Amino acid sequence: MTRSNVLPVARTYSRTFSGARLRRLRQERGLTQVALAKALDLSTSYVNQLENDQRPITVPVLLLLTERFDLSAQYFSSDSDARLVADLSDVFTDIGVEHAVSGAQIEEFVARMPEVGHSLVAVHRRLRAATEELEGYRSRATAETELPPARPMPFEEVRDFFYDRNNYIHDLDMAAERMFTESGMRTGGLDIQLAELMRDRFGISVVIDDNLPDTAKRRYHPDTKVLRVAHWLMPGQRAFQIATQLALVGQSDLISSIVATDDQLSTEARGVARIGLANYFAGAFLLPYREFHRAAEQLRYDIDLLGRRFGVGFETVCHRLSTLQRPRQRGIPFIFVRTDKAGNISKRQSATAFHFSRVGGSCPLWVVHDAFAQPERIVRQVAQMPDGRSYFWVAKTTAADGLGYLGPHKNFAVGLGCDLAHAHKLVYSTGVVLDDPSTEVPIGAGCKICNRTSCAQRAFPYLGGRVAVDENAGSSLPYSSTEQSV
């Protein structure tokens, strides 16, 4: 039997009670029950019963809703709120509530009051920042030598900024594609085309400079309107740097308006967000949405082939794939991550329910770490999270050119993951048995918030449980817990 878009809907939603989500949708669109009923060609009383969970939402009604309101197929499933559920689970684990809050309770809370849930997550972020700042003051007060003043983490704020927007910035993405088309750009040799665009439209001269500092990729001089780009960059990398500057000079007002939508960003984070949005524009310009999305579907998301076609590297392709969430033309919802050998995650974004730990650490059983043992080769994994959701992961190491034999070298592993339901669309799933639960590797978001008490790889005890202490018994499991294993 072939897979289709309808079969998962019928299987997942045949007895779905989603009154809270339907009410939320109606209120977001500014509709009354009468107006919603008219749009769906249903009776008002029937819509009222759906909103009060007196009737399940049937497949025909779901199809009507997704068509009329351009909703994703997962909007009315529990997966649609899974990101918020995961964030709240992290919150309750981190603060150590007196009475355990079950996953079912969190899911019900999110379904009925999602905005309150988002507010709780935001408050917790500020609480953690304040706590870390207080710890910094305490450390300086007790330290023998003076420590630098505690500072906020603007990059974490900006990560949250993109995370909260599912890593897709619609207005900026559309602007990049529109400028690409209107300027007569074509794939291939974009570094040269962009240099001409900067000269003709903005009067900016682009110079390939071999005198820039070793770590500098570009340097713009507003007074002379000269953009200097490092000579050691590859053509695709040069194009990215020029496109980033193009965003900062040509889309400055739009970028400022997008940053202004988040009043929680600190002053320093706003500057970082502007650079992040300029980088987003650059990726969207080099890989224009419709053309790139079409190529990704045709090539079954083969990252290397996409990189060859568009003249960019592995990491750039992976990041762009994670942004393909345009309404009516969505790609596979991906998770994008970059980590080093020590497990430090320097880049992470997700358009899915996959949960990154904010408490510290990542799972050593995660295939992204295995990539370092097989440099430059794709490694794959079918992984299951503690909440029961399964994901398909691919990962590969990327190494930047160093500054000579004795100079420092950068080495990262880049991972790209998606819900297992989408894995068959990826060329990397070839030869992998996707429907066999025995192939799934149980992983978690990080030891401190992972409730897999039977995991032999655990490095820290679970914050939400109690460590079992028994003088008369020994165990091969580190930090044995009194909690039931997942």
Swiss-Prot record:
Q: Which residues form the HTH cro/C1-type domain?
A: 22-76
**Under the GO molecular function aspect, what terms does this record hold?**
DNA binding; DNA-binding transcription factor activity
Tell me the null mutant phenotype. Cells lacking this gene are unable to grow using either propionate or cholesterol as a primary carbon source and the transcript levels of both prpD and prpC are dramatically reduced regardless of carbon source. When the mutant grows on medium containing glucose or acetate as a sole carbon source, there is no significant difference in growth compared to the wild-type.
CDD domains (UniProt xref): HTH_XRE (cd00093)
Listed InterPro entries? Bact_TransReg_Diox (IPR050807), Cro/C1-type_HTH (IPR001387), HTH_RamB (IPR026281), IrrE_HExxH (IPR010359), Lambda_DNA-bd_dom_sf (IPR010982), ScfR_C (IPR018653)
Q: Which pathway does this polypeptide act in?
A: Organic acid metabolism; propanoate degradation; Steroid metabolism; cholesterol metabolism
Question: DNA-binding region at which residues?
Answer: 33-52
Spell out the SUPFAM superfamilies in the cross-references: lambda repressor-like DNA-binding domains (SSF47413)
Q: Which GO terms describe its biological process?
A: cholesterol metabolic process; propionate metabolic process, methylcitrate cycle; regulation of DNA-templated transcription; response to hypoxia
Report the induction information: By propionate.
Q: Which domain of life is it from?
A: Bacteria
The task this protein performs is described as: Plays a key role in regulating expression of enzymes involved in the catabolism of short chain fatty acids (SCFA) via both the glyoxylate (acetyl degradation route) and the methylcitrate cycle (propionate degradation route). Required for intracellular growth in macrophages and for the assimilation of cholesterol-derived propionate. PrpR acts as a transcriptional activator of prpDC and icl genes when propionate is the main carbon source, and as a ramB repressor.
User: Which family does the similarity line name?
Assistant: Belongs to the short-chain fatty acyl-CoA assimilation regulator (ScfR) family.
Q: What is this protein called?
A: HTH-type transcriptional regulator PrpR
